C-alpha cells in the first residue's frame, strides 16, 4: 500500500538518480571500486552515521539496478561498519544472487526468502 508520495519537479528526481549513478560508475564515486566492472548498471548511495568520539561509525549502503529500468533495490546497514563504501560488496552479492536467478529463470518461493 502506497502511503504517500513526494511531489517535485521531474528534473530533481533525475538529478538524484544521476548522482546515485555516479556513486557506482564514476571513478570518483564512493562505490566505484565495487561496481566499476558490474555487468548491470547500478545506482547507489553510501553513508555513515557517527556514534560519538572514539566510536566506529555505523555504515549504510543503498542501491538499485538496473539504473535505467529498476527491478531490485538493496539496503545494507552494519553497526560499527565504518563507511558505506566498505559494505557495498554485501549489496553486490545480493545483486549477484538476484541477477543469477533472473538469468536462470529460477524464482524465489516467496517474499522475504533468504537467498543463499
Short names for language-model regions:
Residues 1-5, 11-105:
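Active-site beta-strand/loop architecture of penicillin-binding DD-peptidases
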Amino acid at each position: 500500500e502506497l502511503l504517500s508520495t513526494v511531489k517535485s519537479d521531474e528534473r530533481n528526481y533525475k538529478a538524484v538518480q544521476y548522482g546515485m549513478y555516479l556513486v557506482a560508475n564514476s571513478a570518483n564515486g564512493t562505490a566505484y571500486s565495487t561496481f566499476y566492472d558490474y555487468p548491470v548498471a547500478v545506482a547507489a548511495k553510501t553513508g555513515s552515521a557517527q556514534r560519538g568520539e572514539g566510536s566506529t561509525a555505523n555504515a549504510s549502503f543503498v542501491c538499485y539496478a538496473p539504473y535505467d529500468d529498476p527491478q531490485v533495490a538493496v539496503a545494507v546497514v552494519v553497526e560499527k561498519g565504518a563507511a558505506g563504501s566498505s559494505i557495498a560488496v554485501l549489496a553486490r552479492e545480493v545483486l549477484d544472487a538476484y541477477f543469477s536467478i533472473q538469468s536462470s529463470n529460477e524464482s524465489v518461493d516467496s517474499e522475504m526468502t533468504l537467498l543463499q
